[in-house]
Amino acid sequence: MRSSTQPHSLGRDADAAPEGRSGLTTFLTRGRVARWVTLAVALIIWFVPPPEALGVQAWRLFAIFAATILAVVIGAFPILTASVLGLASAILTGVLPTKVAYSSFANPTIVLIIVAFLLARSVVKCGLGQRLGFRAISLFGRSTLGLSYAIYVVDAVIAPAFPSNTARSGVLYPLVLSMAEAAGVSPEREDRKRLAAFLMFSGMASLTLSSALWLTAMAANPLGTEIARTYGLDIQFGSWLVAASVPTILCMVVMPYVHFKLVRPEVSAMPNAPAEARASLARLGGLTRDQKIVGATFVGLVVLWGAAASLGVDATAVAFLGLGILLATGVLTLGDIAKEGDVLATYIWFAALFVMSDQLNALGFMEFLGNRLAMRLGGLPPAAAAVTLLVVYVAIHYLFVSQTAHLLALFAVFLGVGVKLGVSAPLLAFQLLFATNYFASLAPQSSSANLLFVGSGYLAQGDLYKWGAIHTVACILIYLLIGTPWLLLVAR
């Protein structure tokens, strides 16, 4: 069993090379083949004459972008390496002008994500996340199902402060592990394995829904809203929360029960868990100075982010203000910032992929692809088209190891096709954005946020594929049947 509380690096491969000589050899061999495949695909697309409706620049940028995404999907390179090579290739071949290529590094949305990563460090450092976890267990933990709801509540509360579900998994995982151990779970106990699996899968699944609830709870969310602006949609913190509230909260109520029936843990009653949590809280004592500062800062951030549109306040500036307060009060130090090395990696690959995706749209490639897909779906009524696009968008995620890469590659295409077929742009945009979050549990590799839970030793790979598929299908049904009328009412 792993007990690490640190999330996996965003700049590394999702699948770590196995230890030992044979594992390393296998990894290098697989990587070498994948790199040749990636290069071959890039060259084939590059030298094939572009379709009549497309210019050479758009076609060659597509060759580079497709190869970049393929490299990540098949494990040729980590996402950082692939993105850097892709951007450099686009610039050096003259496909992207220098000023355009570097413009995304000053994009306010991307800067907001990076600052929010640094803000999230304070929640972990001061222990506020752990305290919230114990409080939720003391309130909800009298049964196994109650523990699952406690996980969902804690995750939903801390989610808006974490722009990375991967980083948030580093806070949530040790809490789930503590719950499991308090319930008598250990690798040696065969009579508690399904209980451990239930709690671990609850942690994985909760991350998918808390990320859908809040705009700032997953790094791809604000990127998606930025892309949606090209269709005249202005999605802010408050409007996202209103749109997500009804279907997402309903999922949070329903899914723990679905998981309980699906996994069938050996133990259903947990009478000692609340007492254990209260004892842990008592040992922690009162709120520390740093916890009070962090709590007050994040309350202020959430309020200002929620009112940013009406007050005319820049959301990125609000994030910088919060970071400044935490640095000025000593809650965070320059040493803490220096430890967040993955933030720089995230900044670079976000910006690189974003500008390539954005320029594909600007050069007409997304419109061209949308027209082709629309021809395939031609004749479908808007309702059927919306459902088809959503289901296909979700199913394709089996091929991706990054939610953000999936969104950057396909969100604009599917939204454009839907609009051409008469689907409401706000409706489809929100449905696709929410799906980008809840499809993260489709497979073990579907999100880097899964890795700590998958590595716990309590989740079998076969079970994960089955449970993940059922969770995702159930979410699709709820978001379609309940979310659609709600979005038609509130989304603009």
Give the location of each predicted region.
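Juxtamembrane and boundary regions of transmembrane helices in multi-pass small-molecule transporters
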Residues: R2-V48, K125-L128, N165-R168, A183-A197, ...
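Interfacial loop-to-helix junctions that mark the boundaries of transmembrane helices
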Residues: L24-G31, E52-R60, V72, K99-P108, ...
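Lipid-exposed faces of alpha-helical membrane segments in multi-pass integral membrane proteins
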Residues: V37-I44, A63-L70, L85, S89, ...
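Transmembrane helix-loop junctions in multi-pass membrane proteins
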Residues: I45-A53, G94-V100, L128, L304-V313, ...
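Flexible hinge motifs at transmembrane-helix junctions and intramembrane kinks/re-entrant loops
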Residues: P51-W59, A66-V84, A101, Y257-R264, ...
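Structural signature of hydrophobic alpha-helical transmembrane segments
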Residues: A53-A63, A106-L118, L172, V313-L323, ...
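Transmembrane alpha-helix interface/packing and boundary motifs in multi-pass membrane proteins
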Residues: I69-P78, V154-S164, M204-L215, A307-S310, ...
